[in-house]
Amino acid sequence: MNFVLSFVYKVKARYKHRTPTFRPELEEQGIELSVRHLKQFFKFGHGRSAFTTKAVHDVSFDIKKGECFGLVGESGCGKTTTGRSLIRLYNITSGSVYFEGRRTSAGSRWNEKEIKWTKIRGRKRIKELKKLQASEIDKLMDTTGLVPEVEKINLELSQIEQELVDIKVVRKDRIAQAANIADEEAKTLKIEEINKEASLEIESRRVRLEELNAKLKEYRQKIKESKKEKPTPETEAKINEVKEKYASEIKAMKDHIDQVEKEQIEAIAQIKYDNKHVDKKLMSKMQMIFQDPVDSLDPRMTVEDIIQEGLHIQGQYNHFKNSQKIKDVLTKVGLLPEYASRYPHEFSGGQRQRIGIARALVMNPRFLICDEPISALDVSIRAQIINLLNDLKEEMGLTIMFIAHDLSVVKYFCDRIAVMYYGEIVELASSDELFAHPLHPYTHALLSAIPKPDPISEKKRTRYVYIPARDHDYSKEAPKLVEIVPGHWVLANSVELAKYNEQLKK
């Protein structure tokens, strides 16, 4: 908190004479919504018991105009959080959201962290440079020739200290294995033997440590005494050269830290400005249909009041015009205009969801976020809602982001599908490509869970269970979201990419 406050005054100084961020290239490319490095974290608790949940971590994707984009994953993977972050129901932690080329939401956590870690890395590097400078000067001033010997002793000391740590780890592992011996007497003897062997190894290394430390102390004393002698003019000139060389490197590092801080403070100021000066009329063109039709409708309000609430927020209070809009939108979603005077509890689940759709459509949106709108409905009603959304998409030219946990639902409805797992997109491709050539193990797991309407094949079907520890080895190289073929992205490292390329060739 103190770190953020330290540069607040600088942010305020750069706050004036700004305009909202606009990226015309997104409009030229026909991109309705662009998400870049979206992160949504939630903090819980206080003090030592505080922890952070990374609900969405570094998610990026584009949705083109008129497209239906599917976001699929199991419960808790961050689908709904992503949708709510896009429509500003949450203040996003980091990243940017662009709607029709304009930045509608952004977070500054990454920028603040960049300043912090640049300073930490910079200070660490400056300390290293000063240490190297002192080492070179010591070598120049040393008349005893013992500086290289001191360096060798220091290296051996660090190796012995690491060996001591390794011995203790090995002893612990061997004792854990010996604990499985059934015979108590044999187990006790084995543990005593392990402890004795480890103690002997530790003692031998401690003796060597004492010898080296004594020798190191002696050498350092001799070097210290030799430094008291005045250096020759030639040596003094070399020392000045070393000081100048490292002084220029240290200055360059300090300049780099200042430059990064200046750039990130400027970026933070722009983010704060964009978040404060969001175009409300533009945001009204982005609407959301919620998952639960019961909880999303206020039971104390009539259907008319529920639908026209958004109009009132936008300052549209003309009763006649609003009533006409409500009748039109109720007709669009397949409900009678007379239902406007009723309350939500008087309707079935499917009808309530249609009211939720009507509430979103009355604002005449261009982008619609559908957060699992059919998961709480009967199977027969689901098809009706899907068909309704499809008709509205064609009639009104809507761009839709459809959130679901079942791949079979979005197979024929969505143009492209992104698969999410624990806050990250693990695979993104067109609907046909994803079902024809699934690559990521988690996608295979979701596809294997889809039941088939064939009793014979259903009996033979084997369910694939995704276990990250078994399916991936990221100990040496972390994964990245890579475009393996045009339009098909997968989260993988270089080893997995080679394997996936072989799969695609077959």
Label the model's feature ranges.
Residues M1-L33, K43-G47, T52, R109, ...:
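Short catalytic/signature loops enriched in Gly
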Residues K321-E338, L447:
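Conserved ABC ATPase "signature" region
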Residues Y343-F347, Q351:
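Conserved ABC ATPase signature
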Residues I357, I385:
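Hydrophobic anchor residue at the start of the ABC signature
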Residues N364:
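Conserved catalytic motifs of ABC-family nucleotide-binding domains
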Residues V410-Y412:
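A short, surface-exposed alpha-helical micro-motif characterized by mixed small hydrophobic
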